[in-house]
Amino acid sequence: MKSNMFTARQIQKMYDFFSSMPWFWEIDAITCRATENSSYRAQAIKLLELDSTHRVLDVACGTGLNFMLIQKYLKNQGSLIGIDVSAKTLNLARKRIGKNNWKNIELIQTDSASYQTEALFDAALCTFAIEIIPPYRQTIDMMIRVVKPGGRIAIIGFKQSSWGYFKLFNSIFKGFSVVFGGVDMNRDVRGYICANCREIFYNEVYGGFYYILVVQK
């Protein structure tokens, strides 16, 4: 199958452009059931089994829509590192942090595959992004590398639906996702990460167009 290949620079420019219109992300989150109160985010984060002592990495954190749910467990303690390639998107995340007076979050602009750290994480997550990040295998490798043995990694990703009549909308969903997100659904994310980690949970949601995957290192 031909893969939708965007370069890291193209993705960065796309998301900087969208972030110059903050209302875009609000509409996108509501339409795609991906708000900061999303049941999909809540389920994935719950399965990370976090507590207030933990150090967590949010890969491609975007505007910070995972932060509220993560803070439910960290309780403004522990440590949360959010990384993203888009500076303008991170600016929106900083506003969210300031609005909520969170003191335990650090934001870093970086290509996720290139991120390095000496201190390991108790858990990592990447939501609605692993099919967008161009070097996705290297990003998965990075998450595995920086998580402690026994730590968990959660992913919410995009896929073609295999659910009944929802399959009729596959081409529309794929086209929309490419144009407004740079999504490449031809990636075998589950197979790649499960070759190196133990699968804890897998479930398809949103008409079969999303999946929630949690693994343990």
Question: Model-predicted segments: where are they?
Answer:
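A short glycine-rich, Lys/Arg-flanked "PGG" loop and its adjoining helix->strand segment in the class I
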Residues: 137-149
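A short SAM/SAH-binding and catalytic strip from SAM-dependent methyltransferases
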Residues: 123-135
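Conserved class I S-adenosyl-L-methionine
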Residues: 2-49, 65-69, 92, 169-176
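Class I SAM-dependent methyltransferase SAM/SAH-binding core
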Residues: 57-59, 63-114
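C-terminal lobe and adjacent flexible extensions of AdoMet/dcAdoMet transferase-like proteins
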Residues: 213-217
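C-terminal alpha-helical "lid/dimerization" subdomain adjacent to the S-adenosyl-L-methionine
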Residues: 9, 28, 33-35, 154-206
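A short acidic, Gly/Pro-enriched loop at the edge of an enzyme's catalytic core
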Residues: 113-124
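Helix-to-beta-strand junctions that scaffold the AdoMet/dcAdoMet cofactor pocket
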Residues: 75, 133-134, 147-148
